[in-house]
């Protein structure tokens, strides 16, 4: 089904000197495996005593090297290498441009707040089904934990998880549960001839799960120790600092279920620790059942006729009246009316992290081509300004990027997020270079040919697979597209000029308030230089970044 999977098959066959047919016929080879063969392998490798040996390197003392005095390199502009000239001479076969067709997916309203998206399966007899319920962890925070358990849950009254998995397997089916801020997902795939039986099993499983108390306790204990140690983990602290800068009190590290609503303990006079787990079978099961009462989009890919599929969908987990959805959820970001600096001190960090945030303007798909062109010009890999000016010229960073991100629905604000990872003693200079790029972007119009080629090919290559087509098309429609974005935008892409990028930059980036977020070693970060150029530095402690 997947083009990339086919490429991987050819790659592996070539690399390991194997026959391509062996990969193509792998399905038949798997079906030919007998129970006796599986038992023989299990006896050979899984029986008897085993020992597990783990070795930890520890953290050896590292030497902090002084910043070398490197003069910026100035590579030649507008010059083409002999390799490039010869590469362009290689003959190519013209490719017929094809576009996505929204008509490939049929939409049908089955009931109020229940919509079917049907895509014909032209490849095989395996169906795929995704139930996308219009509620997520933003409205129902306990879904985060309920979903973890559902992936290993048994079924009432007393069917254990292993037996449930066997029942799915006997029908040639598999399942998984997932959740985001906005949506609760149930994904199922299997042999289409067993569709009705699989849906009956899914419904029983979802509405009557048998959750394991030991797994609940293990999950909550893991959450407890994760929160206990998060202030000591530099990567987590950096993530929490960025969340705080972008979302303030809406940060996921602050706006979450308090630990004392998940677990608490007390110590008896005799020293015995008494644990109380406040998440339990009852409230987690109720959470799942409530989630299946929200508006649901049914994304189905199979060979059955759409009328038969619509009839079968009456068996999915849902209530007589499905509640309206408030999704997708777009968290409100912080806005700043002037450039400011946040700094979190961590003397143990060998590499400092610097983020740059600009809150943008309301998004509209009419901006897509200009935005994509700006992103490619500003941060398009090693040819982009950020990597070229900061890493290639000045050897100032290991990693650097900066691009504009657009929301998943129109009308909400876009934003630019930049990043530089560098040594603490290079932070002040790296900030100066990045800020200069934001406020005085250099002009290299000779790059337009490569940018146009990249955007043209990227637009044509944006073709979702058969099974994901309905969800991708629906997302494009939510943005406001009535046809394939490639078809809509290709003419604008082909007629791009540097003025389009320059205008987008001047209207959205140049001289906008920038929030500079830094985490690094206070002994070597030149805070005086930063303060002199960008004003007051707000020092943030890890305690401010976490709640609950």
Locate predicted features.
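M16 family metallopeptidases and their MPP-like homologs
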Residues: 1-31, 52-56, 64-65, 122-152, ...
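Active-site glycine-rich loop that binds ribose-phosphate moieties when present
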Residues: 278-283
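Structured mid-domain segments that build the active-site/substrate or prosthetic-cofactor binding neighborhood
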Residues: 380
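Proteolytic maturation boundary segments
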Residues: 24-132, 267, 272-274, 285-286, ...
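A surface/extracellular/periplasmic glyco- and lipid-processing/surface-interacting theme
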Residues: 374
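Short, conserved charged micro-motifs
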Residues: 196-197, 306-310, 365-366, 425-430, ...
